[in-house]
Regions:
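Post-signal peptide N-terminal segment of secreted/secretory-pathway proteins
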Residues: 105-144, 411
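Short cysteine-rich clusters marking metal-coordination/redox-active sites
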Residues: 57-59, 118, 143, 185, ...
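Anionic, Ser/Thr-rich low-complexity intrinsically disordered regions
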Residues: 60, 65-66
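Primarily the internal scaffold of c-type cytochrome electron-transfer domains
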Residues: 33-45, 66-105, 133-141, 149-396
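N-terminal secretory signal peptides that target proteins for export/translocation
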Residues: 1-12
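A cross-kingdom marker for long, charged
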Residues: 382-389, 393-458
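N-terminal signal peptide c-region/cleavage motif recognized by signal peptidases
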Residues: 25-26
Length: 458
């Protein structure tokens, strides 16, 4: 749950500052790395290659060195970083806790640590026939869960002349690519057509899920170094480029989930995991209902779709000046309303929203200069202060976006107290108050430099 993560807001000032300096030195990286916004690779769990196991990577001359090495293109202590600091290494062990045992009982499962329903995201749960001699399911979310089965690329990836394309063809998942990384992370941190943390699973005790690519990568203990060599080899975009690709890829994935679970499911009761949790789950005495820019036309007491993965396409489209940017908010309102009318009407609106997202993707594809990050920061902050992002999941996404934009625009240090107050307003989602979040963002706006495009009076 992001409320836990917000206790330590993701800033990593030294590392991010160095990364931003490198991007300034390589301004063409975003334009060169033309993203497809559509993942092209099979996910590691379904890649068809044998997974040889974490132990096959852990030699001290491979990725198990105790200290970072500077004479090679990789640090070579990746295994140590993962096993000591990365929560993915404990993902399987989470299934052994009392809370997981209780969830398994509630779901009618004998044991969480033996159920595919749980192992699919808490381990590298490939078929038994695809497990190598050193494979151990208890390793949790290990190397090959993200980098793909190493059956064919293990021997290749140490060859100096091997290309990224050759490694990719051998099954190495391109986790450095923001679009591919988003698809991979979303497969567990949101869900896809094959696996989903359903309302039933959350009702059994599983925490609410959320995701934003840049923030989650910054919270991940890095087992890589974003230096000149990395940027040249990976052609990585900067923080804003990552955020753009993550947002648009997530939006498209979310559309597919809505279609799968609300249009094509043929069930009487819709999959409630597609809706905003806090629209229903709050104390009856908490009189928080108030229409906002995104909920016009939705009546009090009506379950609302979780728009957190769509809403920020709108300020992005405004920044890109797409022809349909003014149509995005009305389309999102219609999306919310159509969910209570008929699957047919919902399907039509999903098509409309998809077209608007595709237009934004096309604009992002062909942008030849940097988006004004400060103007985008102001736009998101102003909408937050006005109450557009009142719902917790929306406020959460807005906070993560503002935080990374402050980093990208070298404004984080001067705004640190104000940004920390924004995070503090989100610390406990059960006690969250929309007005407190909006007030905190108003204070943040006061310490930001004036933006020439600012038009809203708060």
């Amino acid at each position: 749950m992001m409320s836990r993560a917000f206790k330590h807001p993701p800033r990593s000032v030294v590392r991010l500052g160095a990364f931003i300096a490198l991007i300034v030195a390589h301004p063409g990286l975003w334009a060169q790395n033309q993203p497809s916004f559509l993942a092209q690779s099979a996910l590691p769990q379904d890649d068809g290659y044998a997974h040889l196991g974490v132990a096959s990577c852990a030699s001290s001359v491979c990725h198990g060195a105790m200290l970072e090495r500077t004479s090679t293109t990789v640090l070579q202590n990746e295994y140590v970083t993962w096993t000591r600091h990365d929560h993915h290494a404990d993902a399987y062990n989470t299934l052994l806790t009392d809370a997981s045992k209780r969830m398994a009982t509630n779901l009618g499962l004998p044991n969480a640590h033996e159920a595919d329903l749980c192992l699919d995201c808490h381990a590298d749960n490939v078929p038994t026939a695809m497990r190598g001699p050193e494979f151990d399911i208890t390793d949790g979310v290990g190397c090959e869960a993200c980098h793909g089965g190493s059956e064919s690329w293990a021997a290749l990836h140490t060859v100096a002349t091997v290309t990224d394309d050759e490694l990719r063809q051998a099954g190495l998942y391109p986790a450095h690519d923001p679009v591919e990384a988003t698809a991979l992370c979303l497969s567990c941190h949101l869900g896809n057509e094959d696996k989903l943390a359903t309302h039933k699973i959350m009702g059994a005790g599983h925490p609410r899920l959320s995701f934003e690519l840049v923030t989650f990568l910054e919270l991940l203990p890095p087992h890589w170094e974003r230096d000149d060599e990395y940027l040249a080899r990976k052609r990585a975009p900067d923080l804003l480029g990552q955020w753009i690709q993550g947002q648009l890829t997530t939006a498209k994935s979310s559309l597919r989930l809505l279609r799968t679970h609300l249009v094509d499911s043929n069930t009487t009761l819709p999959e409630l995991a597609m809706f905003d949790c806090h629209a229903c789950h709050h104390a009856m005495s908490d009189q928080r209902w108030q229409p906002s820019k995104l909920t016009v036309g939705v009546e009090p007491g009506t379950p609302r779709l979780n728009l957190a993965y769509f809403a920020f396409v709108e300020p992005l489209a405004q920044s890109l000046q797409t022809s349909g940017s003014a149509d995005i908010v009305p389309a999102l309102r219609a999306l919310n309303q159509s969910a209570h009318v008929s699957p047919e009407q919902l399907s039509d609106i999903l098509n409309e929203v998809s077209d608007l997202i595709d237009e934004t993707i096309s604009a992002a594809h062909h942008i030849n200069e940097r988006i004004d990050g400060t103007a985008l920061l102001h736009r998101i902050a102003e909408e937050s202060a006005l109450g557009t992002y009142r719902d917790y999941s929306l406020a959460e996404q807005a906070a993560m976006a503002m935080n990374l934009l402050l980093e990208r625009e070298a404004l984080w240090e001067q705004s640190r107290p104000a940004m920390r107050a924004v995070f503090a307003s989100l610390m406990n989602e059960e006690q969250y108050q929309p007005d407190s979040f909006a007030s905190a963002v108003k204070v943040l706006l006061e310490v930001l430099p004036e933006d020439a495009g600012r038009t809203k009076e708060l």
